[in-house]
Amino acid sequence: MADLRQFLTEHRESVWELPGDVALVHELTALQHLLDERHQYPILHAKQVRNLAGDRSDVSIVTNLTASRELTARALGIPDHRRTAQWFASRTQAGIAPSIVTREHAPVQQLVTRGEQASLFELPVLTQHELEPGPYLTAAHATTFDPDSGIDNTAIQRCWVKSARQMTWFPYPASHNARNLRKFHARGEGCPVAFWIGHHPAVLLGTQAKLKYPESHWDAAGGVLGAPLRLVPSVLHGERIMVPADAEIVIEGWARPGAVSPDGPFGEYTGYLGGEVTAPLVEIECITRRRDAIYHDYASGLTDMLVPDNMAMEGKLYSLVKAVAPALVNVHVPTEGRRFHAYLQFKNPGPGEVRDALLAAMAYRRVKTVIAVEEDVDLFSPDAMLWALATRVLWSRDVITVEGLSGSSLDPVLPEGVSTTAKVGIDATRTPGYPVVATVPDEVRRKVADWLSGGDSTRWPTI
């Protein structure tokens, strides 16, 4: 069955088992910053760590799991990482219903602690960046349900561990989990919630599918996984909240009405520290885990966190844009643009089709800049995209700017409390009669490529 440890075993050549003790404060995140700067993306596995209580931990840490786009695509069974958009769109829409297992067949419930014995301090939770107030769960999938329909929702949302049995939880105000939370509180009831941590990357990406409200992520996760996702009733909330049976850790509790606490500042996907906010305070009543659990951490604001969500965005944007622009062939959301840039690629678009597509993509909340190119431009090459912008855009003719569209409250350019923004669409496709691109014959390229393979290039300048 697919789980985190199966993936680590299958890709052991990409896993760096870190030697020696690793501190929970800053060290792993600092290493990930350095690796990002070098464009190197090994999975990091730290086994010699202490928990938040300061004791030697029997729970190890895995991070940088999805920093490599190529490796993440292979986890989905996609041989070419440049072909994820259409694949992701079709697999999440098709979906595969989950299967239900009992506790005896759920590794995540091998160890169960409840009440006073359920301590977050038993986990090796990291403090990532300077000025952050403490240790944060960054790969916890918060799972709630709509009290009206009973339909569940799961999403990655940060949690600041404040004590052994309390943590803040920040559901983005426009998120489906936040809607569920508000519904429970409007009834005067506590919101039941479970946070699951650690699974196969295919499951992680499937649960980041962009769906309507209310709509369960479990079918989408099964679609991406290519098999039914195994679920088990949570210990505290029973069948009202199901959790992945093959996860590593589950934290269960309640977000009571009026129970709030300061949260932040926190390093966001933008690369900047978000300010302090008021967030729900969760009372922890149960923790379940595997006997040799692996704690999964996402490096916030680095490729490790950007790659999987950007892939999910590519699938959603492909579906949105393809509906109005049949000539669309590919979509890319580059990590260099965080989640604010989207690139669209076309084959023989008709009159007005590119502009229709630009406007459709601009309607997606996170996206601020959309660039359209043709098939001869490599979406995944920053050099090629800059070349297209420099040589195929007449700025007075090829740019669409729209004010007052929905944006992200995490966008650092927006004043506090403002949720709308200006967006731009750029048509970098060629007009009729455009000059021919200067090229060399393919057979000559292949011939001289053989010369390169026989030379020692280790000392050649690279910049």
Language model: regions and residue ranges:
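Extended, highly charged
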Residues: M1-L281, E285-I463
